[in-house]
Design a protein with these regions (language model features):
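Active-site microenvironments in enzyme catalytic cores
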Residues: 1-8, 12, 17-21, 36-135
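Conserved "landmark" site that anchors the functional core of diverse proteins
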Residues: 25-29, 79
Length: 135
């Protein structure tokens, strides 16, 4: 099952189900309108979304439309927080070397995680706007 958030003029977008081959999609508004709703009530909503996904993938969804990735927002445009893990040792070694710092021995056995508060996230095809140049 593929879920996405489509631009609809709101800050949170509209939840859609996308076909396996990324050719078509269907609004999930009869089930949930926002991705956060799905995460908050996964056990109840995911089976319904899975059923819609199967219907879409079998070409039987009545109101399917052509999927356009440029219309996608970030899956969760406004998340409560985010977490990031540095799991790629090669990347960490290169970054540390560029800064002239050693990789701590504990990094090879203890995962490095950090979190931050969220503002908003950009979609995969959205422009990054330099706020200093906006008048």
């Amino acid at each position: 099952m593929k879920l996405a958030t489509y631009k609809d003029g709101s800050r949170d977008g509209q939840l859609i189900v996308v076909s396996r081959d990324l050719s078509s999609a269907h609004y999930a508004s009869g089930i949930a309108t926002r991705m956060q709703q799905v995460l908050d009530d996964w056990n109840f909503l995911s089976p319904q979304l899975e059923e819609l996904s199967q219907t879409l993938n079998h070409g039987k969804a009545r109101h399917a439309f052509a999927f356009d990735a440029r219309m996608c927002m970030a899956p969760l445009p406004r998340a409560y927080q985010w977490a990031d893990g540095s799991a790629f040792i090669n990347h960490v070694e290169l970054v540390r070397k560029a800064r002239g710092a050693e990789v701590p021995e504990s990094f090879y056995t203890d995962p490095l995680m950090y979190q931050g508060g969220s503002d908003d996230f950009l979609g995969p095809c959205d422009d990054i706007v330099d706020r200093k140049s906006v008048v």
